[in-house]
Amino acid sequence: MQLGLNYRSDNVIKYVGKFGGVTAGGYWSFGNGVAGAGEVAGQFRRDTGYGASLSYSGGPFGATVVYDQYNPTLSATTGATGAFRKVALAASYETGPVKVMGGYRWGLNKGTTDATLLRDNYYWIGANYQATAALGLTLAYYYDDIRNVAGFNVKNPWQVTFIADYAFSKRTDVYLTTAYSKNSGLNFDTSAISFANAYYLGAGADNMIGVAVGVRHRF
């Protein structure tokens, strides 16, 4: 949902440790950004990013909790930074040929003056069904409850996705993917992350559908 170049983290140190059914991870980005120049002497916080995750997988059940924060430069003139925070929880359960999964992500973007740029609750639920040894089906639903965007309460976007994948062999498969989206009439880049790249919906252009078919071969 959120666009812009600020979401790519370079210059990263990452750790992943596995302890039985538990996997722990963490990362630190030393400095990257669009408006800023990355690492700046005497400005340790500028364009930094960090996060941590903890997941468990045991038998048919799996669960994950994740925290992520990025402190992008929002003013190239003053070097002032914002704070974009995300916390996510997700779980899955598998029984026979069916695997169901769902999750929740809390989000809060703060600007240079600590004003709220974006506050939202993002939900998703889906299922994988292995119909045959070769045919796999996936259905998923995504919903973003946008509570506040720069002082406005806008319509909530959502999307339904369906994927069918048929394997000819261990290395070659063909797939069909479709999605229907109900869009929100919002310029996310400017309003939600203070980025210069902007887009607006045209009149009546509040939904879209996409279909793709392809063949994949693994080398």
Name each model-derived stretch.
Residues 38, 77, 114, 151, ...:
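Outer-membrane beta-barrel and related beta-rich outer-membrane complex signature
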Residues 45, 50-167, 177-181:
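Detector for outer-membrane/organellar transmembrane beta-barrel domains
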Residues 21, 134, 170-171, 205:
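Short loop/turn motifs that connect adjacent beta-strands in outer-membrane beta-barrel proteins
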Residues 185-189, 198-206, 217:
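Primarily extracellular Gram-negative trimeric autotransporter adhesin
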Residues 1-4, 170-175, 179, 186-192, ...:
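Outer-membrane beta-barrel biogenesis signature
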Residues 162, 168, 203-219:
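Outer-membrane beta-barrel "beta-signal"
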Residues 1-50, 195-200:
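Surface-exposed coil loops of outer-membrane beta-barrel proteins
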